[in-house]
């Protein structure tokens, strides 16, 4: 049924009791295979630079920053991230090795409207396509929706970045559209694809991750059921 105002115009649904959401804090988020720590250049910089170096310059093709030719350049980048007003960066720690293997950041933080974006998703070769990679994403989502009670969680990428598009869809983000020629970076034009998860979708997505990450879903390190299959079963 349409929601009409006093002029008979159709308007959006009322948001009862809405209040401005809290700005994300520099917290530690703990999982079974990993934890997220506030990104610190002294604690994590050298480990991350070493881990990223294994992938070479191609790791930075679709990111506005990098590649970095030496550790000092990368440490300066971490410093800039931590000084950016609407950015909260995290390092992903492999609990088995206690080493930093990647980063995730909360960016474009809009407390008034309860919206933010996950960005600077930089996974080392060691982290890519692992259980840790998925659990790290889940830990950050849980913090955003369960602890901070945000309404909207965004993912954006270069339209030509196939791995990023596929990752977003696998994790449960919905494609919203493409902004054409929205950015010039590294001397190139960029069309940006937008994806999101909103609060009313979160319960099913959370249950999907919980079932996928359960130890009974793995045998000799191999998944028995994929995330897409679990999510589909929960929608029936």
From Swiss-Prot:
Gene3D superfamilies named in the record: 3.40.630.30
Entries under Pfam families matching the protein: Acetyltransf_3
Residue ranges constituting the N-acetyltransferase domain according to the UniProt record: 47-191
InterPro entries: Acyl_CoA_acyltransferase (IPR016181), GNAT_dom (IPR000182), Ribosomal_N-acetyltransferase (IPR051908)
Domain of life: Eukaryota
Transmembrane segments: none
SUPFAM superfamilies in the record: Acyl-CoA N-acyltransferases (Nat) (SSF55729)
GO molecular function, one term: protein N-terminal-serine acetyltransferase activity
Protein name from the UniProt record: Uncharacterized protein YIR042C
Organism: Saccharomyces cerevisiae (strain ATCC 204508 / S288c) (Baker's yeast)
